[in-house]
Amino acid sequence: MNIHEYQGKEIFRSMGVAVPEGRVAFTAEEAVEKAKEFNSDVYVVKAQIHAGGRGKAGGVKIAKSLSEVETYAKELLGKTLVTHQTGPEGKEIKRLYIEEGCAIQKEYYVGFVIDRATDQVTLMASEEGGTEIEEVAAKTPEKIFKETIDPVIGLSPFQARRIAFNINIPKESVNKAAKFLLALYNVFIEKDCSIVEINPLVTTADGDVLVLDAKINFDDNALFRHKDVVELRDLEEEDPKEIEASKHDLSYIALDGDIGCMVNGAGLAMATMDTINHFGGNPANFLDAGGSATREKVTEAFKIILGDENVKGIFVNIFGGIMKCDVIAEGIVEAVKEVDLTLPLVVRLEGTNVELGKKILKDSGLAIEPAATMAEGAQKIVKLVKEA
């Protein structure tokens, strides 16, 4: 689950992580009123959308007067902002974050992530702040420093200080930086985050260490422990199909292709998309039906896939373990009838009750193309979509 920058900074502030003063605004008039509350001559007007790259896309403005705050607010509100993370359709700006300006001395990058290779939380940091960390990793990987954190001990003060020294935090600010990192780690753990990224972290002329921009993602599987976090969810920033999928316990992510996919298991789903790509097709989505799909769930999955007007064909790839192939087959037949499917449909079943499942599909009299393997199924759906 994602939240807005201003919401993340409120969490930081409440847990002892230093951030500049800021207020959220929904109108240009409100933006000016919020700016008046600051003891500053410089203000930062920031578009609030669930995507990075806002600065490069023109979504962050520096205002040196209240009149400029109003001008920038009017310019941004209602605008569709396109960044490298939004896709070409962009996202509409519906709210702004008005922040007090600060005298930046140097920008840095700091992030806490879960390292799948070590199964531990890793602190990453670089003195190349303000740019995409992927770009730094590609061009100057030697400028990225890491600390692997023992889950029993947590982030140690000496690790925080070592990172601060490695990224050349000024000596007079090292202790503040270490305290900052320890507080940030506490946010990561206490709020069950999957990522906490500060880019940039800044030191100021006054020797302070502050969050200038932040990204927080939460582990969806832990949200039941954080009702306060769930309340921060902005459904207007999410794909309606993804929202509908979550209601039916389906994992759905929209992509920009034209072949809809319904699979059980995240690993098989990714392998299916890779296979479609290998044979020259483009997946329209990632959809994991999970291990306990019912007929109703399969029907809802079809409806969600067909909610994407770009879909020109569907590939169902199911391995029946807990999920029995005959139940899936019955669900597919019912779904095809209910949604009155006219698009090409290829189904590959394997596992428990597979022969019974195949018989149900064959006896249905519907235009369902069977496939014996994932590769065969991918080839068939790519061919059918191209011929359609």
Curated annotation (Swiss-Prot):
Binds 1 Mg(2+) ion per subunit. GO terms for biological process: succinyl-CoA metabolic process; tricarboxylic acid cycle. Keywords: ATP-binding, Ligase, Magnesium, Metal-binding, Nucleotide-binding, Tricarboxylic acid cycle. Substrate binds at N264, G321, I322, M323. Residues 9-244 form the ATP-grasp domain. Its cofactor is Mg(2+). ATP binds at K46, G53, R54, G55, E99, C102, E107. Heterotetramer of two alpha and two beta subunits. Succinyl-CoA synthetase functions in the citric acid cycle (TCA), coupling the hydrolysis of succinyl-CoA to the synthesis of either ATP or GTP and thus represents the only step of substrate-level phosphorylation in the TCA. The beta subunit provides nucleotide specificity of the enzyme and binds the substrate succinate, while the binding sites for coenzyme A and phosphate are found in the alpha subunit. Belongs to the succinate/malate CoA ligase beta subunit family. This is Succinate--CoA ligase [ADP-forming] subunit beta.
